[in-house]
Amino acid sequence: MAAKIIDGKTIAQQVRSEVAQKVQARIAAGLRAPGLAVVLVGSNPASQIYVASKRKACEEVGFVSRSYDLPETTSEAELLELIDTLNADNTIDGILVQLPLPAGIDNVKVLERIHPDKDVDGFHPYNVGRLCQRAPRLRPCTPRGIVTLLERYNIDTFGLNAVVIGASNIVGRPMSMELLLAGCTTTVTHRFTKNLRHHVENADLLIVAVGKPGFIPGDWIKEGAIVIDVGINRLENGKVVGDVVFEDAAKRASYITPVPGGVGPMTVATLIENTLQACVEYHDPQGE
């Protein structure tokens, strides 16, 4: 069996085009364009690349994009003060603080300071709690983007045995809740899991998010499984690969996401969707 490739790049472009059309319709109706504030503290090169892609996506769909590039020496108090200002700004629908933050700044305190209705990353405990209680509002971008991919490929997830490898706050944990909502029987594995291979071999739907190149061998994959590879790992030779050995896994899976061009583009597309949702549902006058 040769797996069908889940083309995240194409689906992400579709999502962005849909958002752009809705923004044009808003402006034609006399409503304002959604606004996203992107805050970067310090000069982490990887963060700069991520932030640039988010700002570019904003401008492409017609959002107002506001950039705040703060020096590495910024204090926690100064960052919290900026968030307070953005929370009170009626032209800003989403606030994104790029992680990781420099040493000395408490990530949790910063994320909790963002108003839940402007938390377009979906990391605020309120939004995570809403997802947990089956009443989601703004949802974490990567897990939601993965669900969108499955939906757009008409993959029926109800009753599937889903296995998530990696239990991070950004992907693994919220992913498990999205999969429960999607009707899966969900197992979350992590660094202390015994006999990982056994779990992988029984997975109808496998989501791998550990950040280790080639962590899952292709011969572990169940015949006909759906494989979603969240890993983005740059090798010494410059090649970008996922957490799954793609060539071998693709021989056994029914569907598989490539790296790059699979999950990555969906994260930014979902951020854009979340910002429009925040604008329409929580900040428009009729949304009150």
Curated annotation (Swiss-Prot):
Reactions listed under catalytic activity: (6R)-5,10-methylene-5,6,7,8-tetrahydrofolate + NADP(+) = (6R)-5,10-methenyltetrahydrofolate + NADPH; (6R)-5,10-methenyltetrahydrofolate + H2O = (6R)-10-formyltetrahydrofolate + H(+)
EC number: 1.5.1.5, 3.5.4.9
Pathway entry: One-carbon metabolism; tetrahydrofolate interconversion
Pfam families: THF_DHG_CYH, THF_DHG_CYH_C
Manganese among keywords: no
InterPro entries membership: Aminoacid_DH-like_N_sf, NAD(P)-bd_dom_sf, THF_DH/CycHdrlase, THF_DH/CycHdrlase_cat_dom, THF_DH/CycHdrlase_CS, THF_DH/CycHdrlase_NAD-bd_dom
Residues annotated for NADP(+) binding in this entry: G166, A167, S168, I232
A Gene Ontology biological process term: methionine biosynthetic process
Keywords from the named record: Amino-acid biosynthesis, Histidine biosynthesis, Hydrolase, Methionine biosynthesis, Multifunctional enzyme, NADP, One-carbon metabolism, Oxidoreductase, Purine biosynthesis
GO CC aspect terms: cytosol
GO molecular function, one term: methenyltetrahydrofolate cyclohydrolase activity
SUPFAM superfamilies documented for this protein: Aminoacid dehydrogenase-like, N-terminal domain (SSF53223), NAD(P)-binding Rossmann-fold domains (SSF51735)
HAMAP family, sorted: THF_DHG_CYH (MF_01576)
Biological role stated in the UniProt entry: Catalyzes the oxidation of 5,10-methylenetetrahydrofolate to 5,10-methenyltetrahydrofolate and then the hydrolysis of 5,10-methenyltetrahydrofolate to 10-formyltetrahydrofolate.
Family: Belongs to the tetrahydrofolate dehydrogenase/cyclohydrolase family.
Quaternary structure annotation from Swiss-Prot or TrEMBL: Homodimer.
Protein name: Bifunctional protein FolD
Name of the gene encoding the protein in the UniProt record: folD
